[in-house]
Amino acid sequence: MNNWAITTSKSRGKHNLGLSEDAQRLANELKIPEIARDNKGIGKLIEQYALDILLVEEENSLVAHWQDGQSFNYHPGMSVPRIKHIKDGDSDMLVDVLGIASGDRVLDCTMGMASDAVTISFALGPEGSITALESSPVIYAVTGYGLKHWNWQQESKAMRQAMGRIVPICCKYETYLQELREKEKPQYDVIYFDPMFERPIMESSGIASLRKAADYAPLTQEILELAGTLCRKRVVVKHREGTLKHLHFDKIEGGKYSTLSYGILNAK
């Protein structure tokens, strides 16, 4: 892990207030050293402590600041309009491909900013559950905190509840899946992967900064097939044309009018 630390916003630092309970819990879990804000600027703190990344707890968000001036903070992104469409009775391609039903258990192996996870959680309803894995400690910290604290007036109560039902875990999916092998029966109905694309078609500045901390390890056929033995229904992998030619699926859905499609491997 790069050299990093966590601190408070200027307003909290000015009043000698430390990290909130949730931020402190994250710092303890990820072993992130806490430094005093002392009314200093972010650039000054990064320089003073020779940091690669500084996490700053702002109001309702945890922001990652890089040495080069870029920053990354949580936003639910496309899950906002997607959930609105679902509420209006429209279909969602991913939800349809997953084949989930109310009460199902889903494992999202690549949380990222959790746009897909939030949408899935909403579709599952309060009876369902979703666990979201993230191998990058920085992305895990920012997104995990954001899921718990995001508070934008335009978001519906149902959406905030969907965000709150997601269980984030900082772990490589290879490790987590290997541990699942020891269970007597499948723990999840559906397992989902959204590997990070090395060459995005287009992206916002927020996604660009997230990519600095992302894990680009490729999904292998071995892991894909292992996942197929650990779920009750199917494994679904989001991919863009040409990015996952090395993987073999039972079928591919989508892609006719979109650059994205989904590979499906039925449970074994």
Question: Where on the chain are the PLM-derived regions?
Answer:
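Mobile active-site "lid"/loop adjacent to the S-adenosyl-L-methionine
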Residues: 195-223
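S-adenosyl-L-methionine
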Residues: 1-105, 114, 133-190
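Conserved proline-anchored active-site loop of SAM-dependent methyltransferases
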Residues: 107-116, 187-204
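Local beta-strand N-terminus motif with an aromatic residue
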Residues: 51, 187-188, 232
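Conserved SAM-binding loop of SAM-dependent methyltransferases across substrates and taxa
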Residues: 113-127
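Conserved Class I SAM-dependent methyltransferase catalytic core
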Residues: 220-267
